């Protein structure tokens, strides 16, 4: 990995050495993407591309290229964002799998943001008890988070990702070309997961943001290196702990509080923005518990602010957010578990913090 943080980015392959080893390949263009999909899918005869509405043209182009290579390729359009991750949407996908005759030898392609890769992975995990899936994420958030690591799932009225399974992809295709047309708000939101990787593991990431926040949002600046670094952090964790029994919990930094904000806001908040305020709350919680310094918390605010991420949330009372946090999948024995930092780059768990600590962190995080 280069240290120049420049645009001289060459194709990069990051191996995720977990239960079923696979590669995340970072490059530019649909030609590269098609070639990597064919390589990863192996003897597949049939492809189903599950995609979001804005990606209909890219799905059609990919389908055309797969057909030209001698394969049957089908497309199925799903709703945008979290509205795609429902039991009804999953049932519609299963119907399409049956209609096009998808067998255990075939491959699903998840084309789109995190909701598309989450749903496509869930369909692949459940159709005929598991078929191959290749993820082709098209948002920054999906590239560095949702598409890597094998988590799949759909939402229920009770909460986010409560139904799902672990089902690793055969490959993840990170096509930097799609970032050229990604709305700025999506680029900013996706940055939250990269910043998170810096706070929990690779502190070099934080230095890159501090040196030039604008270059960190530029597909021809330092962003490609940041993407690779964030994926490497996740790959290193997932290789040790696929199913979130221990180490993988550190990837949830900012997520316990962030998911509560998302749920309370009925998913109107972008995931990255919610995780950003979650990191502030959890940094303030660590400070209240005597772990982090005021300077460490300020560093959180400064970096998140520098790329346009939210650093406070006052849309709900703490008790309302605690009710949502009480349903978090990481909880054990009725106690809410938080990922916090002992120091920058060194995460730990804080289980069942006192109401006094929670209220102090909440007051500080909303600026009270």
Curated annotation (Swiss-Prot):
Gene3D superfamilies hit by this protein: 3.40.50.1970, Dehydroquinate synthase-like - alpha domain
Disulfide bonds: none
Record function comment: Catalyzes the conversion of 3-deoxy-D-arabino-heptulosonate 7-phosphate (DAHP) to dehydroquinate (DHQ).
The keyword Nucleotide-binding appears for this protein: yes
Annotated residues for binding of NAD(+): 80-85, 114-118, 138-139, 151, 160
Protein name: 3-dehydroquinate synthase
Pathway named in the protein's UniProt entry: Metabolic intermediate biosynthesis; chorismate biosynthesis; chorismate from D-erythrose 4-phosphate and phosphoenolpyruvate: step 2/7
UniProt: Zn(2+) binding residues: 193, 255, 271
Family as reported in the entry's similarity comment: Belongs to the sugar phosphate cyclases superfamily. Dehydroquinate synthase family.
Annotated catalysed reactions: 7-phospho-2-dehydro-3-deoxy-D-arabino-heptonate = 3-dehydroquinate + phosphate
Record keywords: Amino-acid biosynthesis, Aromatic amino acid biosynthesis, Cobalt, Cytoplasm, Lyase, Metal-binding, NAD, Nucleotide-binding, Zinc
């Amino acid at each position: 990995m280069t240290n120049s943080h420049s645009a001289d980015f060459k194709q990069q392959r990051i191996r995720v050495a977990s239960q079923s080893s696979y590669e995340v390949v970072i490059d530019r263009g649909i030609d590269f993407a098609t070639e990597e999909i064919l390589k990863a899918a192996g003897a597949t005869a049939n492809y189903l591309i599950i995609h979001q509405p804005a990606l209909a043209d890219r799905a059609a182009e990919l389908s055309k290229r797969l057909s030209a290579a001698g394969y049957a390729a089908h497309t199925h359009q799903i709703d945008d964002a979290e509205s795609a991750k429902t039991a009804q949407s999953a049932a519609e996908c299963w119907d399409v799998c049956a209609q096009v005759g998808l067998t255990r030898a075939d491959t699903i392609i998840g084309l789109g943001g995190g909701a598309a890769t989450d749903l496509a992975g869930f369909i692949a995990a459940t159709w005929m008890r598991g078929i191959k899936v290749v993820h082709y994420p098209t948002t920054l958030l999906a590239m560095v988070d949702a598409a890597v690591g094998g988590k799949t799932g759909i939402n229920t009225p009770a909460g986010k990702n409560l139904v799902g399974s672990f089902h690793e992809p055969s490959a993840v295709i990170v096509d930097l070309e799609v970032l050229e047309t990604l709305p700025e708000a999506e680029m900013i939101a996706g940055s939250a997961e990269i910043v998170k990787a810096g706070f929990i593991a690779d502190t070099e990431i934080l230095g890159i943001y501090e040196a030039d926040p604008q270059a960190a949002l530029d597909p021809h600046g330092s962003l490609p290196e940041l993407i690779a670094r964030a994926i490497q952090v996740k790959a290193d964790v997932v290789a040790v702990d696929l199913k979130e029994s221990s180490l993988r919990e550190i990837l949830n930094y900012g997520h316990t509080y962030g998911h509560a904000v998302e749920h309370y806001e009925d998913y109107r908040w972008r995931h990255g923005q919610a995780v950003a305020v979650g990191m502030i709350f959890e940094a303030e919680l660590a400070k209240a518990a005597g772990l982090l310094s005021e300077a460490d918390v300020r560093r959180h605010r400064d970096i998140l602010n520098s790329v346009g991420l939210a650093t406070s949330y006052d849309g709900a009372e703490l008790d309302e957010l605690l009710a949502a946090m009480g349903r978090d999948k990481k909880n054990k024995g009725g106690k809410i578990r938080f990922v916090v930092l002992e120091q920058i780059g060194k995460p730990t768990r804080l289980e069942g913090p006192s109401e006094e600590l929670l209220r102090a962190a909440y007051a500080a995080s909303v600026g009270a």
